[in-house]
């Protein structure tokens, strides 16, 4: 869909948008409904809180590694790998109930978060140049904020309709692949 924005021509491709927006909607939904996830999985009250250490550690490590990888291979080449850890995290949430799976789940989300933070800036600069990077970042940040609201609302609607975490995670597993 071509879009004119502050004198620049910017093409938002569905696959790029869905790739970039999957991380914020799934991660935010997970963070907001962590007590529901913990209860659904039968985890103790501190399991997810402790698992955020894995999220933080893997996110920071991935931030450093992804910068090096982008310089070596380019953002476009790495973009296709950004949501693989997120996909794996959703599979872990769907299939596994042990407390240890919470650490794996949030660690994998941390990896996707680290990739998304770096790729979220460098991808647009690679594709469209830096002349209108402020306008492009403003638009993509607005879309990201919408994505976080969408994810939280979708989680809430599915939970309010009586679904357990497994069907909710399955929904979040399949939606980003529909583009």
Would you name each region that the model predicts?
Residues 1-7, 12, 172-179:
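Single conserved hydrophobic/aromatic residue that forms the stacking wall/gate
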Residues 13-53:
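Extracytoplasmic gate region of multi-pass secondary transporters
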Residues 38, 69-70, 156-163:
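Interfacial helix-cap and linker-helix signal at transmembrane-aqueous boundaries
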Residues 56-60, 64, 149:
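Residue-level signature of mid-helix packing/kink "hotspots" within the transmembrane helices
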Residues 63-74:
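Helix-to-loop junctions at the C-terminal end of transmembrane segments
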Residues 78-91:
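Structural signature of the two symmetry-related core transmembrane helices
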Residues 115-128:
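Intracellular juxtamembrane helix-capping segments at the cytosolic ends
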Residues 133-160:
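A late C-terminal transmembrane helix in Major Facilitator Superfamily
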């Amino acid at each position: 869909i071509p879009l004119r924005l502050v004198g620049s021509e910017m093409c938002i491709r569905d696959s790029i948008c869905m790739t970039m927006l999957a991380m914020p909607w799934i991660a935010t939904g997970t963070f907001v409904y962590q007590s529901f996830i913990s209860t659904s999985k039968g985890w103790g009250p501190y399991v997810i809180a402790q698992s955020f250490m894995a999220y933080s550690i893997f996110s920071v490590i991935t931030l450093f590694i992804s910068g090096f990888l982008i310089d070596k291979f380019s953002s476009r080449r790495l973009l296709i790998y950004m949501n693989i850890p997120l996909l794996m995290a959703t599979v872990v949430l769907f299939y596994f109930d042990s407390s240890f799976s919470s650490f794996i789940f949030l660690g994998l989300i941390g990896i996707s978060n680290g990739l998304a933070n770096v790729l979220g800036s460098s991808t647009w600069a690679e594709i469209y140049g830096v002349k209108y990077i402020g306008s492009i970042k403003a638009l993509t940040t607005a879309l990201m904020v919408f994505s976080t609201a969408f994810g939280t609302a979708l989680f809430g609607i599915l939970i309010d309709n009586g679904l357990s975490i497994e069907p909710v995670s399955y929904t979040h597993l399949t939606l980003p692949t529909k583009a």
